[in-house]
């Protein structure tokens, strides 16, 4: 029996139902590195997964980076579930609606390769994984599988998926995606974090790490001065205002229809919204794994329907 593993291949992080790690990848060639944490051995080469951030790839299939990160994600999820390292897997992944039809065949082929099973070692454990199927679903909309009641409560709503590089927008009418309204803004969390880092450097001369900025944006502990914290919070509010303005300019009236916000940036916006923004209604699906969970539920639902035919 095969297992379903949902994977959200973000620009900023790779997420499964139980794991999340940065989408960075460092190649060490044939030389084993100093660490076993995140260490992937594949094809006679060594890679450390989750180390920092890699350059933005608009086409994730141009090299093997996201395939290697997929293997790491499978290994991490299998370990979390307590499953054997030799098993069959069905991958449920996603793409933005703005590029869904164009990129779906290529991304599916990229993840589903002919050489099966896939043999690799991750953090010292040998894996033999047979990838039986790869199913691709629309990002954001699939995440609503985790909160199906939302689709029944409102005739129209705006879905805002705040990812690492882009914020994907789409209106949903009577529980059906209005595909012609799909729009993508390059205002994801990478942009937010980079702008904050630059502003802190400009005002204080300090160079913050991504992790420090992320913690402060989430309201978590971080040893910095009150001045730095104030700059970060001010920039978080500025980012939120910019995002709301860009969304309105894209043709979505946030004063008239409810908005469902999800993805890694949703928690930032939730902490920096103000009553003076005058939004109709905001619903937050917090947690960076909702897309991955939604992909899994979507594939499970498709499988059930097929078995009933």
Predicted regions and their residues:
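Conserved blade-register residue in beta-propeller folds
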Residues: 16, 169-171
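Nucleotide/phosphate-binding catalytic cleft detector across ATP-hydrolyzing
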Residues: 1-157, 176-191, 203, 210-309
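A contiguous pocket-lining binding segment that forms or flanks enzyme active sites
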Residues: 199
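Ser/Thr-glycine-rich phosphate-binding loops at phosphate-binding pockets of nucleotides
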Residues: 162-168
């Amino acid at each position: 029996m095969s297992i379903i593993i949902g994977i959200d291949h973000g620009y900023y992080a790779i997420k499964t139902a139980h794991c999340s790690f940065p989408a960075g990848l460092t190649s060490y060639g044939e030389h084993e590195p100093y660490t076993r944490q995140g260490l992937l051995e594949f094809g006679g080469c060594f890679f450390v997964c989750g180390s920092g951030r890699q350059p933005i790839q608009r086409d994730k299939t141009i090299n093997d980076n996201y395939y290697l990160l997929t293997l790491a994600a499978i290994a991490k999820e299998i370990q979390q579930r307590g499953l054997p390292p030799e098993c069959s897997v069905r991958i449920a992944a996603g793409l933005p609606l703005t590029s869904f039809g164009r990129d779906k065949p290529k991304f599916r082929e990229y993840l589903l390769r002919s050489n099966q099973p896939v043999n690799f070692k991750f953090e010292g454990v040998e894996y033999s994984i047979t990838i039986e199927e790869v199913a691709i679903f629309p990002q954001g909309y699939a995440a609503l599988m985790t909160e199906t009641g939302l689709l029944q409560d409102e005739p129209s709503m705006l879905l805002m998926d705040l990812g690492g590089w882009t914020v994907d927008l789409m209106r949903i009418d009577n529980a059906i995606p209005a595909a012609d309204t799909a729009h993508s803004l390059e205002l994801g969390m990478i942009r937010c974090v980079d702008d904050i880092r630059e502003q802190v450097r400009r005002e204080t001369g300090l160079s913050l790490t991504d992790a420090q900025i992320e913690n402060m944006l989430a309201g978590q502990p971080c040893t910095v001065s009150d001045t730095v914290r104030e700059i970060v919070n001010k920039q978080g509010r500025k980012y939120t205002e910019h995002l709301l303005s860009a969304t309105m300019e894209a043709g979505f009236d946030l004063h008239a229809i409810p908005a469902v916000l999800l993805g890694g940036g949703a928690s930032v916006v939730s902490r920096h919204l103000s009553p003076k923004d005058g939004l109709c209604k905001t619903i937050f699906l917090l947690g960076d794994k909702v897309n991955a969970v939604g992909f899994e539920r979507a594939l499970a639902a498709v499988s059930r329907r097929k078995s009933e035919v």
